[in-house]
C-alpha cells in the first residue's frame, strides 16, 4: 500500500460513500472537515464499529466538526449513470454542500470525483484518515436509518436487517414479491426479478 502523507493545509475534508453494493435505495456520501481543537476519540471505519458506537459518534461528529454535509444519488440516477458515476456525483454533492470550503479533499478508495479543489484518493482511507472515518460514519448511519424506514413500508423484504444488500433472503423475497420502486433497475438480480433480459 502506498505511503499516505497528510496534506499540509488547514481545512481538509474527508469523503466516503455507503451503499454501492445494495440492490435498493440511494448511494449516500458524506464530507467532513474536523476541528483539530475538538478531537473525537474512537474514529474508525464505520463497518468495524458497533451500531451503538456509530450512533454516539454520529452525534459527536455533527457537534464538533467545522463542517459536514451529506450527498446522495437516487436509484434512478444510479440506473441512468451507473453506480460508479452516480457515486462520484453523490461525492461532489457532499463536498458542494459543505458550509466551509475545504482547501483539500481526501476521498476513500482509488478514485476521486472532479472537484474544484485539490484532492487525493486514499486506499483504505476509512481506517487511515480521521476525516474519512468520520464521513463513513455519517454516511452509514444515515443510510441505515433510511433502510429501517423503508422496512416499515415494505416489511416483507427485510431491509432493516440486510440494508438492501443481495443476501439470500433479499433475493428470495425479490423473486417472490418483485421489485419496489426503490430497487435499482440496472442491477442484474433486480432485472432478473422483473423478467428483463440482461
From Swiss-Prot:
Record PROSITE patterns: RNASE_H_2 (PS51975)
MF term (GO), any: RNA-DNA hybrid ribonuclease activity
CC cofactor: Mn(2+); Mg(2+)
GO cellular component, one term: cytoplasm
SUPFAM superfamilies on file: Ribonuclease H-like
InterPro entries the record matches: RNase_HII, RNase_HII/HIII, RNase_HII/HIII_dom, RNaseH-like_sf, RNaseH_sf
Gene3D superfamilies documented for this protein: Ribonuclease H-like superfamily/Ribonuclease H
Record field: catalytic activity: Endonucleolytic cleavage to 5'-phosphomonoester
Its EC number(s): 3.1.26.4
Signal peptide coordinates: none
Amino acids binding a divalent metal cation: 16-17, 108
Gene Ontology annotations of biological process type: DNA replication, removal of RNA primer; mismatch repair
Main function: Endonuclease that specifically degrades the RNA of RNA-DNA hybrids.
Protein family: Belongs to the RNase HII family.
Entry protein name: Ribonuclease HII
Amino acid at each position: 500500500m502506498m505511503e499516505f502523507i497528510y496534506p499540509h493545509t488547514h481545512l481538509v475534508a474527508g469523503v466516503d460513500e455507503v451503499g454501492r453494493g445494495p440492490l435498493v435505495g440511494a448511494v449516500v456520501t458524506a464530507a467532513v472537515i474536523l476541528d483539530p481543537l475538538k478531537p473525537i476519540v474512537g474514529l474508525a471505519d464505520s463497518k468495524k464499529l458497533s451500531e451503538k458506537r456509530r450512533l454516539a459518534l454520529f452525534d459527536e461528529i455533527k457537534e464538533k466538526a467545522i463542517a459536514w454535509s451529506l450527498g446522495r444519488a437516487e436509484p434512478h440516477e444510479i440506473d441512468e449513470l451507473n453506480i460508479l458515476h452516480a457515486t462520484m456525483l453523490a461525492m461532489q454533492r457532499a463536498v458542494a454542500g459543505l458550509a466551509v470550503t475545504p482547501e483539500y479533499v481526501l476521498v476513500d478508495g482509488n478514485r476521486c470525483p472532479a472537484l474544484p479543489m485539490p484532492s487525493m484518493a486514499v486506499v483504505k482511507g476509512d481506517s487511515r484518515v480521521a476525516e474519512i472515518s468520520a464521513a463513513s460514519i455519517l454516511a452509514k448511519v444515515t443510510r441505515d436509518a433510511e433502510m429501517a424506514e423503508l422496512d416499515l413500508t415494505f416489511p416483507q423484504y427485510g431491509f432493516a436487517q440486510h440494508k438492501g444488500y443481495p443476501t439470500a433472503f433479499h433475493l428470495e423475497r425479490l423473486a417472490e414479491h418483485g421489485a419496489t420502486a426503490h430497487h435499482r433497475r440496472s442491477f442484474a438480480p433486480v432485472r432478473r426479478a422483473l423478467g428483463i433480459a440482461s
